[in-house]
Curated annotation (Swiss-Prot):
It is found in: Cell membrane. It is a multi-pass membrane protein. One of its GO terms (cellular component) is plasma membrane. The keyword Transmembrane applies. The chain crosses the membrane at residues 155-175, 203-223. Keywords: Cell membrane, Membrane, Transmembrane, Transmembrane helix. Pfam families: DUF2127 (PF09900). This is Uncharacterized protein Mb0093. It comes from Mycobacterium bovis (strain ATCC BAA-935 / AF2122/97). Signal peptide: none annotated.
Length: 256
């Protein structure tokens, strides 16, 4: 029962090891190494530093306990999964913005043809009984056609810049870089007032969901990654991360 509960608790570690393989290490501390090694009929096995299960074969590395690779496990691994999911969301958003910028640019070059089509077809549609003058899409299209070319060029540039911003943010988060986390918090926070302004003009599902995701991302990164000195800052985060390492846990178990 206890073993099953441990597997449930370590499911993300097991999934990660299943995808990327186990990580084993032989410390030069004999007593500590003995707690990580076992013998079977198939040969020696070593405990994985991430999931804690035994893996068949020799250790992948040897050395002092303090030189063991820093493996993401426990809370750190769960944080990495969440942050990478946020990074994927940012990259998808960057792609959508880039496509929007391309669409506006293409529209800017095809305004004449679109206007000619509307001038030719709208009267026909009205005569056929279609209430085209009440269609939101038609109003939006006519408004866009009335915009100056310089305005459309400015919109294209702003969308492209925002796409680049989201792409940088997404890459930094996916790579789990500290600068990416800081960049994400600052870049996202800058646009929160604009999102509040949009919500004040009218509440829509898209606006509410976008605002909620961004606020949650900022709060989560600040608290979980201890950015800008929150909860002790980087030093406290490193201490917490080191405390989750299997070798440290095993050393602590030896002293009890």
């Amino acid at each position: 029962m206890a073993k099953n509960q441990n597997r449930i608790r370590n499911r993300w570690e097991l999934i990660t090891c299943g995808l990327g393989g186990h990580v084993t290490y032989a410390p030069d501390d004999a007593a500590l190494a003995a707690r990580l090694r076992a013998s079977t009929g198939l040969g020696e096995v070593w405990r994985c530093l991430r999931c804690g299960d035994f893996a068949l074969g020799g250790p992948q590395g040897r050395g002092a306990p303090e030189d063991a690779p820093l493996i993401m496990r426990g809370k750190a691994l769960r944080q990495a999964i969440i942050i990478r999911a946020l990074g994927v969301e940012r990259l998808v958003r960057a792609l959508v913005l880039a496509l929007a910028a391309w669409a506006v640019w293409e529209f800017r070059g095809a305004r004449g043809a679109i206007q000619a089509t509307l001038d030719r077809d709208l009267p026909v549609l009205r005569a056929a009984g279609f209430k085209v003058d009440q269609m939101t899409v038609i109003h939006a299209l006519e408004k866009a056609l009335a915009a100056k070319p310089s305005t459309l060029a400015l919109i294209t540039g702003m969308l492209a810049a925002y796409a680049v911003l989201q792409a940088v943010e997404g890459v930094g988060l996916w790579l789990l870089k500290r600068w990416g986390e800081y960049f994400a918090v600052v870049a996202t926070s800058i646009f929160l007032p604009l999102e509040v302004h949009d919500l004040a003009k009218g509440i829509t599902t898209t606006r509410v969901v976008t605002f909620s995701i961004n606020v949650a991302a900022v709060v989560y990164l600040l608290i979980s990654k201890r950015l800008f000195g929150v909860r002790g800052g980087r030093k406290a985060y490193d201490v917490e991360r080191r405390g989750e390492q299997l070798l440290d846990l095993e050393r602590a178990a030896m002293l009890t």
